[in-house]
Amino acid sequence: MRIDVLTLFPEMFSIFNHSIIGRAIEKEILKINTVNIRDYTIDKHKKVDDYPYGGGAGMVMAAQPIVDSIKTVKKENKGKVIFLGPKGKTFNQNLAKELAKEEELIFLCGHYEGIDERAYEYIDMEISLGDFVLTGGEMACIPIVDSICRLVDGVLKSSESYEDESFYNGLLEYPQYTRPATYEGKSVPEVLLSGHHENIKKWRKAKSLIITNKVRPDLFKKYKLTEEDKKILKDFNKKL
């Protein structure tokens, strides 16, 4: 997958040179480029923003450098142009899975009070990270790109690494334990030490369902319980 990020702060994306994403870039599974929008301004002082027409607080990013940077990147990257903004669709795991199927993507990071409305003509999709305010689009872009990239084939060693994680199947993840088996008087559940893979699988599913219902009832309501799920919960409750 190739991703180009249009930003005023390309240095912020050096985080992708590390850990899982960094290794995927080294293996050429991923290619993440940053493009400095400021390089495309025709203003002699390298300004990319100006006062809003009609007055108001703050500054607005000008259309010209945004549009010119998009046009340049589009010569090599034919992917969707995604703007990180408050009017967009709220990002979630399903959207991450959908975008992970793309071969190329372009992300536009806004700043200041927003972007000139005329730049929207070159934007295919707007995504919001949530109902809160961030300093700039970069802060939203980094977790979104990370979430998408880790679902690309070959980035993780196995699909099992993400298929059991929170949100992937609409549920929160089950509790995790590691050595020692007993710590401060608290022991790991016996089923996890049993070596019985089917029982472990059922325990994890039951805990995932119970935790989701308890802390994220909104997610649980959207989840469609199967007959197997109902049986797993019934059997689990009998053992309590």
UniProtKB/Swiss-Prot annotation:
Catalytic activity: guanosine(37) in tRNA + S-adenosyl-L-methionine = N(1)-methylguanosine(37) in tRNA + S-adenosyl-L-homocysteine + H(+)
PANTHER family cross-referenced by the UniProt entry: TRNA (GUANINE-N(1)-)-METHYLTRANSFERASE (PTHR46417:SF1)
MF GO annotations: tRNA (guanine(37)-N1)-methyltransferase activity
Source organism: Clostridium botulinum (strain Langeland / NCTC 10281 / Type F)
Keyword S-adenosyl-L-methionine: yes
Assembly with partners or alone: Homodimer.
SUPFAM superfamilies assigned to the protein according to its UniProt record, in alphabetical order: alpha/beta knot (SSF75217)
Alphabetical list of InterPro entries matching this protein: Alpha/beta_knot_MTases, tRNA_m1G_MeTrfase_C_sf, tRNA_m1G_MeTrfase_TrmD, tRNA_m1G_MTases_N, tRNA_MeTrfase_TRMD/TRM10
GO terms for cellular component: cytosol
Family membership noted in the UniProt record: Belongs to the RNA methyltransferase TrmD family.
Keyword Cytoplasm in record: yes
Protein name, per record: tRNA (guanine-N(1)-)-methyltransferase
